Each structure stands twice: as structure tokens, then as C-alpha cells.
Amino acid sequence: MAKKPVKDLKQLGHATPVPASPEEATLERVPNPHPDANYVARFTVPEFTSLCPVTGQPDFAHLVIDYVPGKWLIESKSLKLYLQSFRNHGAFHEDCTLAIGKRLAGTLAPKWLRIGGYWYPRGGIPIDVFWQKGKLPAGVWVPDQGVAPYRGRG
């Protein structure tokens, strides 16, 4: 891949503080070197954190983001910083999960994208949130997200 796209990045290779909020975070993208191929790129985030908008208590989730790129790939440092910006952000589980999926879809215009948000129990109830954009191209292999259903002590 050409070096020019890397040169244009503002976060990769630079000391970059965690943004104060998801709205302030910058998601960067790079050209997909294989836009003609249908393949899945996966990001697994086992320690995602946000805040309950009512109590201010921390909420934790295991996120799995799968997408079939079009012309663009997400630059992973910018994704990491974006996700870390939720650490002090108050929002319900559904809002966090869909906000991430929609922001990625808007930035990348992928052929297909899905996000699974597997939220750890609060008040004894785990909440799993799933969102998908687009139709999966034929013939693309997408592995199971690999997150076991919550069983507690049952």
C-alpha cells in the first residue's frame, strides 16, 4: 500500500489523548488495498466501558464488530480512541451499541457491517444488543462471534 494514506493520518504514530466524548472523537480511515474482494474484518473489544446515564455507575461489554469493507478500512488506533471515549460517556446499552455501529457505517460505507454488544449484567440482567447494516455479500464466511450466552450460576 502507498505511504501517502499513512502520512495523512493524524493519530497513528502520534501521541494522541483519549477524546473527552464520542462526539469529539475522530475516526480515521485508510484505502482498502483489496476493494474487489469480499472478506470480513473483525474487531473484538472484550473490555468496553461506558457509564449508566442514570446512576453514573460503570457498564461493561464485550463488543464484536464485523464488516465487509468497500473502499475503506478503519484505522485501528482511531477506533481504539473512539471506543475509549465512551469510558466517561453516559448512555444506555442499546444507544452505545447502535451509536458505534452507525458511526462506523457512516465513516466507512462498508458493503456490510454488524455489531454485537454483549453487556455484562447490571441488576442481574445481561443485555445483548445486535445491529446490522446492509446485506452480507454471497459467499462471505463470517465466523460465529464466539461469545457464550450468559449463564450466571444456572
Swiss-Prot record:
GO biological process, one term: tRNA modification
Annotated Basic and acidic residues bias: 1-11
Keyword field: Cytoplasm, NADP, Oxidoreductase, Queuosine biosynthesis
Chain segments carrying region Disordered: 1-31
Catalytic residue positions: 52, 59
Pfam families according to UniProt: QueF
Pathway as given in its UniProt record: tRNA modification; tRNA-queuosine biosynthesis
ATP-binding listed as a keyword: no
Alphabetized InterPro entries for the sequence: GTP-CH-I_C/QueF, NADPH_dep_7-cyano-7-deazaG_red, QueF, QueF_type1
One annotated Gene Ontology cellular component of this protein: cytoplasm
Superkingdom as given in the UniProt entry: Bacteria
Coiled-coil regions, chain positions: none
Oxidoreductase is among the record's keywords: yes
Cell location: Cytoplasm
An example molecular function term from Gene Ontology annotations: preQ1 synthase activity
Task of the protein: Catalyzes the NADPH-dependent reduction of 7-cyano-7-deazaguanine (preQ0) to 7-aminomethyl-7-deazaguanine (preQ1).
Family: Belongs to the GTP cyclohydrolase I family. QueF type 1 subfamily.
PANTHER family cross-referenced by the UniProt entry: NADPH-DEPENDENT 7-CYANO-7-DEAZAGUANINE REDUCTASE
Protein's name according to its UniProt entry: NADPH-dependent 7-cyano-7-deazaguanine reductase
